[in-house]
């Protein structure tokens, strides 16, 4: 499995390493390799596979916000459920790739979680952060 996490650059930046990583994502997808994306990784997967990422009109989204799992998702059953995610982003997915499934959204982030077939899963929120870690990052100026 592969994991792509956060970055200070944008998924739509025209940098050589981003272009190369998007090509790698397409190759992983073609070969049905497991891939998880978090924040920048979520956005980069969407961009690489035909979605769109833009700067959020509302600006930075920083904090803990409830996301709602969509009904009838293969992963989570038939009931809508809420869960909290820690967000720290100013870019967001505005159009999902054609073959993806929207799994969760929130008031502040319409595309909070995506799946593509059974091998790609991505989150806009930082599932790798706990609250104490996020507070520490905020205090030293690494968030927002």
Model-derived regions: residue spans:
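Residues at alpha-helix caps and immediate loop-helix transition turns in enzyme cores, especially N-
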Residues: 14-17, 98, 134
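A short, terminal or domain-edge coil/loop segment
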Residues: 32-42, 88-94, 140-142
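Cysteine-nucleophile active-site neighborhood
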Residues: 7-73
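Pocket-forming structural segment of enzyme catalytic cores
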Residues: 49-132
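Acyltransferase
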Residues: 129-144
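Structural motif
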Residues: 3-5
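Alpha-helical elements of Rossmann-like donor-binding domains used by nucleotide-donor carbohydrate transfer enzymes
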Residues: 20-24, 101, 136
């Amino acid at each position: 499995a592969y994991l792509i996490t956060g970055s200070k650059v944008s998924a739509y930046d025209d940098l050589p390493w981003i272009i190369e990583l998007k090509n790698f994502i397409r190759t992983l997808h073609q070969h049905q390799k497991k891939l998880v994306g978090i924040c920048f990784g979520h956005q980069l997967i969407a961009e690489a596979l035909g979605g769109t990422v833009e700067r959020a009109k509302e600006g930075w989204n920083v904090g803990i916000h409830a996301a709602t799992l969509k009904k009838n998702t293969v992963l989570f059953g038939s009931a809508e459920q809420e869960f909290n995610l820690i967000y720290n982003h100013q870019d967001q997915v505005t159009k999902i790739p054609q073959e993806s499934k929207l799994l969760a959204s929130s008031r502040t982030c319409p595309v909070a979680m995506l799946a593509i077939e059974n091998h790609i899963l991505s989150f806009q929120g930082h599932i790798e952060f706990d609250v104490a870690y996020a507070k520490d990052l905020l205090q030293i100026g690494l968030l927002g």
